[in-house]
Amino acid sequence: METQFLVSGRNSNIHCRIDSISSSSLTPKSSPVSTSTPTLVVFPPFKLVSKSLRTRSKPRLTVCFVLEEKELRGKLVVASDDDDGAGEVRKQREKEISASAEKLAQKLARKKSERFTYLVAAVMSSFGITSMAVLSVYYRFSWQMEGGEIPLSEMFGTFALSVGAAVGMEFWARWAHEALWHASLWHMHESHHKPREGPFELNDIFAIINAVPAIALLSYGFFHKGLIPGLCFGAGLGITVFGMAYMFVHDGLVHKRFPVGPIADVPYFRRVAAAHTLHHSDKFNGVPYGLFLGPKELEEVGGLQVLEMEINRRTKNNQS
């Protein structure tokens, strides 16, 4: 029986042929067995392998090295470009910061000058109006008592109407603020709701408008005797007192147009200032329109919680 195997590899072939004894032969006899020595060559010789490896690895290593070098050079070029770009961005940012700082310094200097100008105007007007009011009250009653009679009814009417006029001005200002200033006179009042440029604004003309009837009432009451002139004198005095209080609380405390000193430490005035700040925020459709009774207006529309939050915010800002 003859069996033949053929195994083919990548680089070699294996041939094996076996001649065995026939199964019919019972007696032992020597018969030539012809076997061919199998040849197994799985890999090529070591020298060839090492030679092929060397020839293959050298170009590959060289190519990798060249690619890495090119890649490194590219990264260096990109990094250099990034450094140049970062330097330009840094210079541009420094210029912007310097320009912003210069603008801020100019703005602070302008604000300081405006506050000083308004402070001088407020002090002079307050001192002048207060001194004139005190002197006019003194001389008016001293002249009336020259005959030895004390006009009690006239004096009582004067002081009563002074208080009444001051309180009434709050309600007048509240109505006028909503019905006139935020309506037909908005073109003048609008300057008060925009950032102010300069120490004064167009809205300040309303102070002059309110001063005209006060001066007229004071003049008539000062130069005439009797109950009616005394009442007119008191009304003018009340309007004047309200105007001075309005200037210190509204212009000084709320809008910080000049320092007000210990007025800022009065708890109720802090509530008034916070309430008027909410008027400028339009959170309650402009409410409150009044000044000294502003917290009461907010209570009527359910804004007490927001008012307390605004008071706390202003307190933190003042402390910082």
UniProtKB/Swiss-Prot annotation:
The histidine box domains may contain the active site and/or be involved in iron binding. The keyword Zinc-finger does not apply. A motif (Histidine box-2) lies at residues 189-193. The lineage of its organism: Eukaryota, Viridiplantae, Streptophyta, Embryophyta, Tracheophyta. It is found in: Plastid, Chloroplast membrane. Signal peptide: none annotated. Keywords: Carotenoid biosynthesis, Chloroplast, Hydrolase, Iron, Membrane, Metal-binding, NAD, Oxidoreductase, Plastid, Transit peptide, Transmembrane, Transmembrane helix. Belongs to the sterol desaturase family. One of its GO terms (molecular function) is hydrolase activity. Disulfide bonds: none annotated. This is Beta-carotene 3-hydroxylase, chloroplastic. A motif (Histidine box-3) lies at residues 250-255. A motif (Histidine box-1) lies at residues 177-182. A motif (Histidine box-4) lies at residues 276-280. The chain crosses the membrane at residues 118-138, 152-172, 204-224, 228-248. GO terms for cellular component: chloroplast membrane. Its EC number is 1.14.15.24. It is a multi-pass membrane protein. Residues 1-78 form a transit peptide. It comes from Gentiana lutea. It catalyses: all-trans-beta-carotene + 4 reduced [2Fe-2S]-[ferredoxin] + 2 O2 + 4 H(+) = all-trans-zeaxanthin + 4 oxidized [2Fe-2S]-[ferredoxin] + 2 H2O. Nonheme diiron monooxygenase involved in the biosynthesis of xanthophylls. Specific for beta-ring hydroxylations of beta-carotene. Uses ferredoxin as an electron donor. InterPro entries: BETA-OHASE-like. Residues 165-292 form the Fatty acid hydroxylase domain. GO terms for biological process: carotene metabolic process; xanthophyll biosynthetic process.
